[in-house]
Amino acid sequence: SVCVETFVSGVHHKSMEVFVKVVGEDLTTGERYLAATCFTTFVAIPSHMNPESDFQLAAVVPETAEEKLICSNYETRRQQRLALREETKLFSQHLTTDLPWIDSPL
């Protein structure tokens, strides 16, 4: 079986990072193991009913030692994501949408 644990691991104005941990368990032996981890980012947007609303997400208050460790590195991960986003934008400028089997001369 698997058990999925998630918690908000950082916020910045209108975005939040969520940490996901998947723990597997061998049902015959009861042995547990770390099956997967990941970070996902969500961006909050104003409601279409109230597009002018200005809001900011509340700060994260980690409780356990694990949460404190993971939350303490949020800003580093955020900066890495922003840098990677810029690198990806630059990289994608060199890619085409041509279909080689259609758009290439024979």
In which residue ranges do the predicted regions lie?
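Functionalized membrane-embedded alpha-helices
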Residues: 1-6
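HotDog/MaoC-like acyl-thioester-processing domains
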Residues: 7-106
